[in-house]
Amino acid sequence: SWNCPLYVGDSPTGPFTEMGPFISMDGTPFVPCDPCLFTDDDGRIYMYAFRGVDIPGREGEFISTVVGYELDRTNPVRVVNGPVTVIRQNTHANWWERQGGYNQDEEFGWVEGPHLLKHNGRYYIIYASPDTCTPNYCMAVYYSDEGPLTGFVCQKKNPLTYRIEGLVKGAGHGCVEHGPGNTLWAFYTIPARSTHEYERRIGMDLVDVDENGELFCPSGVTFTPQYIPSADTKKGAGENSTHELPVNTRYIPTASSFVAGREPHFSSDESPLTWWQPCDDDTEPTLTFGLKQGTYRVTASRVWWKEQGLDYAAGIVPGPFRYIIEGYNGKEWYTLLDRSDLDTDLNIDYCDFDAGICKAVRIRIVGWPKGITPGIVDFTVFGRRYVEGAE
C-alpha cells in the first residue's frame, strides 16, 4: 500500500491495466500511500491518502496526516486540486491515535488507511490508528457537512471499531459501506501475524447513525454469530446478534496427538499466534471438548486452520481441509456437521447447522492439502445452555 498506481478495467473483476503513477499539479509523478477513490454525486472524483509531514528540526520524525485530492475526470491520474490536509494527527486529544499497544506514545501515531463514505449528504472519512500490528488498532471517523475536501471535524463517538481482547481484535484499516435496506456495514482487518507481520483476516459489523449524525457500531466489534446483511430476520433497533455464544472457549480439550509446544489447549486460547498441531503420523487428528457441567444446544461452529508447511515456491499450496464435527448427548456420538467432501479452500470455515444437544463436542480431521500438516488456530462451537422443557 506504500506505492499504489491507478489501474483501470472494463469490469469490477478485471482484467486491469496500470495507468501509471499519479501526476501532481506541478507535473511531478507520485504514488500515494493507502489511497481511496470516491466519486461524488456530481461526477467529480476525489482521492484520499496517507501523507507524512516532516517535523522541522527533528530529523526522521513526522506527523501523520490524511490528504485529499480532486482528480481530472477525463484522466484520473492527473490531480487538479490538492493535496489538501483533511485530517491531522492529534494524539494529545485523540487517545486512540497514540502509538503503542497501550496508546502510550502521546507524540506520535499512524493516521492511515482513509476511506470516504457519503451518507445522507454528509461526508465521512473513516481512518485507522494507531498501528497495524497492535491489538488496539481501530477505525475512527471525521465528518464534514461542507464538502469532500473541507470542514472535517472529529466525531464524539470515536473510535468506531475498537476491541483489544480475544480472537477478533485490532479492527482497523477498513471502510464503511452501504448494504441492503439502507443499512451501513463496517469492514475491517484483523491482525493474524502468524506467517507474516502484516497477515490479516477480514471482519464486518453493523453500523448505525445516532441523532447527531455520528457513526457507531451498536454491537461493537463482534466475535459471535451475526445475521448477514440480507437476512430477512426481525431484529430490534441496531440488533444483529443471533445470541449464540461460544461454549468451549478456554476449555482444555484432549487430542489424538500433538507435537511439543503445540498442545491441544492452543486451539481454544483466543490467540491467532498459537495453534494445535497433531503428530505427522496421526491419520485422523481429533480434538475433543467436554462442556463441563453444562448441556448445550449447539447450532454453529468456526474452524480457523493453520497451514503448517505452506510453500508456494515448492508447489505446496492451500486447499480444502475436510472434517466432521460430532456431538455427544450423554449416550452416543452423532454428526453435527459433515464437511468430509469439502472442495473449497476456507482458511476460516464458519457453518451453522441443525441444533444438537451436547455434553461434549469433537472435530475429526479426515483430509488436508498435500504437503501441509494440519493445525487448528481456533475451534469454537456456538450455542446456548440447554434446559429440558424450556425454550
Language-model features: where?
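Short beta-strand segments within Ig-like beta-sandwich modules, predominantly Fibronectin type-III
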Residues: 340-343
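Surface beta-strand/loop "capping" patches
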Residues: 222-245, 282-290
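Predominantly extracellular/luminal regions of secreted and cell-surface proteins
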Residues: 64-80, 87, 231-269
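Active-site/pore-lining binding-face segments in mid-to-C-terminal subdomains
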Residues: 168-169, 173-186
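Short beta-strand segments enriched in hydrophobic/aromatic residues
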Residues: 51, 129, 188-191, 305, ...
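Beta-propeller and closely related beta-sheet repeat lectin domains
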Residues: 33-36, 112-115, 172-175
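Aromatic, loop-rich ligand-recognition surfaces of beta-strand-rich domains
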Residues: 269-337, 347-391
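Beta-rich carbohydrate-recognition and catalytic domains
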Residues: 1-33, 40-106, 118-166, 181-183, ...
